[in-house]
Amino acid sequence: MSKKARPRIYNRAGKRIEVQDKTWYALQASGEASERVIEVFVYGEIGAWGITANQFVQDLRAMDDGVSPVIAAFNSIGGDLFDGLAMHNALSRLGERCTGRIDALAASAASVAVCGAHRVVIAANAMLMIHNPWTYAAGDADDFRKVADVLDQTMEAIIAAYKAKAPDIDEAELRRLVAAETWLTASEAVALGLADEVGDGV
């Protein structure tokens, strides 16, 4: 790894699958002006091979009137952690008018992103997955030690994102679940505080 390169930290379930179609997310506004709801669909990987945080934020800003409710719907295996964190923070800044909706899967970086919403509703047959960040590396021993340090630091960012959503969660238990790569059912996610409500889905 180049000593000047920023490591790309992944938080993604499974191996990356190359596809050509990049239309993996969409935004739409529905209803009259007084009852307008903005829906953001994040369906696919997060990062340069799918939807980047820059695209997400710029498109959301173009539609957001500062008043209407925003629903961010997720079906994503995750991707680039830093893009996920940026999405998390963008949703958090919307405050109480933002709802995160897990339609099928919010894994890895997507689980970090959706937890930025004020309220999270998870479909009864959906899942949320949490695990350690990971990356690729090359270089000498010093390079690998530096990469390990960065992974430790990004782990703290992940824990902080989950704790912001679920402040009452036992941190030791949270760290154990993250380290073990844990797949949570809808009811388990609600029990932990990472989701607020089980929605439709079956």
Language-model segments: which ranges?
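N-terminal organellar transit peptides
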Residues: 1-109, 116-202
